[in-house]
Amino acid sequence: MKKVLADKESLIEALKLALSTEYNVKRNFTQSVEIILTFKGIDMKKGDLKLREIVPLPKQPSKAKRVLVVPSFEQLEYAKKASPNVVITREELQKLQGQKRPVKKLARQNEWFLINQESMALAGRILGPALGPRGKFPTPLPNTADISEYINRFKRSVLVKTKDQPQVQVFIGTEDMKPEDLAENAIAVLNAIENKAKVETNLRNIYVKTTMGKAVKVKRA
């Protein structure tokens, strides 16, 4: 494992602290747990660091990501059986043309938008204007995909993406999960970006924290 990646033991140690009462005050909701990577010597305006990786988490968080699916006619029944949060047929998608309010609601409520290839252009026209400002996008649903496996994978997937600051902040689970499971999810995120340009040479620090809690710095070799 490369030196920029924190080992599992260091992650577990930091996560235990982040979940402790010293760093995390209990709220009346289940808080998310995030990993934060900060970078040095990066000019985001010049595009020095560009990350956009979809990462399936090995341990399913209790808060599954919401998935909207636009399947082909042949995929429709399989898609319904896989229990995504929303299933929309191509015909129903067409009827949303010009319907800004319901389209914005779908964009706001769902995280992933799996679109069969035959409907990608249509989805881009209808959903795109609402998805773009939210940093979301249609993802192709191949004709040959195992629908159930594909949908379930995205229910536990996160997007690792840089914005306008030299850092990335990624959901890795919820505070009711074991530190060991959260650490596995954190490692999946780190492994997905370790070979990207500027990550190894410009990584400053790694932190973990709950939604409302204090950040805990992860020890690195």
Curated annotation (Swiss-Prot):
InterPro entries: Ribosomal_uL1, Ribosomal_uL1-like, Ribosomal_uL1/biogenesis, Ribosomal_uL1_3-a/b-sand, Ribosomal_uL1_arc, Ribosomal_uL1_CS. GO terms for molecular function: rRNA binding; structural constituent of ribosome; tRNA binding. The keyword Cytoplasm does not apply. GO terms for cellular component: large ribosomal subunit. One of its GO terms (biological process) is regulation of translation. It holds the Pfam family Ribosomal_L1. Disulfide bonds: none annotated. Keywords: Repressor, Ribonucleoprotein, Ribosomal protein, RNA-binding, rRNA-binding, Translation regulation, tRNA-binding. Part of the 50S ribosomal subunit. PANTHER family: 54S RIBOSOMAL PROTEIN L1, MITOCHONDRIAL, LARGE RIBOSOMAL SUBUNIT PROTEIN UL1M. Belongs to the universal ribosomal protein uL1 family. Probably involved in E site tRNA release. Binds directly to 23S rRNA. Protein L1 is also a translational repressor protein, it controls the translation of its operon by binding to its mRNA. This is Large ribosomal subunit protein uL1.
